[in-house]
Amino acid sequence: MFDIFKKNKLGGNGGENLYVNIGALLINVAKVDENYSEQEKEIIKKTLLELGLTKTDLKDVFKKSEEVEKNSNQILEFTKEIKNKDEDFKIKIVEALWKIIYADGVSDMYEMSLMRRLTGLIYLDSKIVGNIKDKIKNSFNK
């Protein structure tokens, strides 16, 4: 059985559904620019592991995340559980989202629009989001 029902590093019993939804959200953002790269997939997998998913469960959860994202028509369902998590958890998600956006070296208006909607849905202060964006963008420009 899945080990992901154990307490994750950031507190609370995450459960499989949380990780699948986070993965689906990250995949959705990665696909917005119609360039879903291996680098983006690696960022998504690394993020899931950093949030407490075990290596044993990564393959299955990632596959389910891709299926859920493919069969979904709105991002709201991916953010329901995230919005109730603590700020540190949300910051890790937003950092991963910006890493995915800047992985190809550019950001477009669709990615920016999606980020504004997402950060509103998870209730994270826009100043924090802006600081994270600048930090990630600068790390890719080095």
Please give the residue ranges for each predicted region.
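Small-residue-enriched hydrophobic alpha-helices in membranes
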Residues: 1-28, 37-142
